[in-house]
Amino acid sequence: MAIQHRDPRGGGGSRDARTNRRIKAREVRVIGAEGEQLGVLPIDQALARAQELGMDLVEVSPMAKPPVCKIMDYGRFKYLEKKKQNEAKKKQVVVQLKEVKLRPRTEEHDYDTKIKKVRAFLGEANKARITVMFRGREMSHRELGQKVLQRVIEDLRDVAVIESAPRMEGRQMFMILAPNPKMLQSQRDKAKAAAAAAPAAAPAAGAPAPTPAPAPAAPAPAPAAADPAAQR
């Protein structure tokens, strides 16, 4: 039985609900395994009910008077709760910060390639750090770095907003861009529209194929003309 084999200390840490012999109340209000109300029972009788079903008695509302307990398979309950938590974590969006490094005089092809990468990264709801690196005497021409960053802002205006304005840090000038909320909302709207349109476009599952229309009957052959020679 579940009660006989369960550690009386619970083994689940202080956050676990009290189960079985750990329940201290003398009387408890019991909810059955199917959600039915069993009323207020002495703790020994409630434990016996759970044991008959091979389940646990779990204190679900300890502050109630009397405490509310439910008969359930507590091990399975904990497993399902853990599974739900893991699935919720998978659905959480993890925002990453990708850095793209430029020079005050970056070649046009290199610039275009990196801007495309930043655009794609922002489209995935991530952030981007755009860094302009100065070398040697370039430090005396910081305005070139400002021009580069301003160009980036203009080129990505439709997909990005400035989260951290351009500033110097040592021999680098950088800014941080975040995804444009309007762009993200547009993506969500398009995804919803596509999902809604998909079932309508797909043929109904199991629907019989339409019966082809019968081919028109061939016309009857015309009677042969009488031979004049035969009539003589």
Curated annotation (Swiss-Prot):
Transcription recorded as keyword: no
InterPro entries: T_IF-3_C_sf, T_IF-3_N_sf, Translation_initiation_fac_3, Translation_initiation_fac_3_C, Translation_initiation_fac_3_N
GO CC field: cytosol; membrane
Location of this chain's protein in the cell: Cytoplasm
Compositionally skewed regions (Low complexity) per UniProt: 193-208, 223-232
GO function terms (MF aspect): ribosome binding; translation initiation factor activity
Pfam families according to UniProt: IF3_C (PF00707), IF3_N (PF05198)
Pro residues: bias regions: 209-222
Main subcellular location: cytoplasm
Keywords: Cytoplasm, Initiation factor, Protein biosynthesis
Gene Ontology biological process terms in this record: ribosome disassembly
Residue ranges of the region described as Disordered: 1-21, 184-232
Signal as UniProt keyword: no
PANTHER family, per the entry: TRANSLATION INITIATION FACTOR IF-3, TRANSLATION INITIATION FACTOR IF-3, MITOCHONDRIAL
Entry function: IF-3 binds to the 30S ribosomal subunit and shifts the equilibrium between 70S ribosomes and their 50S and 30S subunits in favor of the free subunits, thus enhancing the availability of 30S subunits on which protein synthesis initiation begins.
NCBIfam families: infC
Subunit field text: Monomer.
Family per similarity comment: Belongs to the IF-3 family.
Name recorded for this polypeptide: Translation initiation factor IF-3
Encoding gene (name): infC
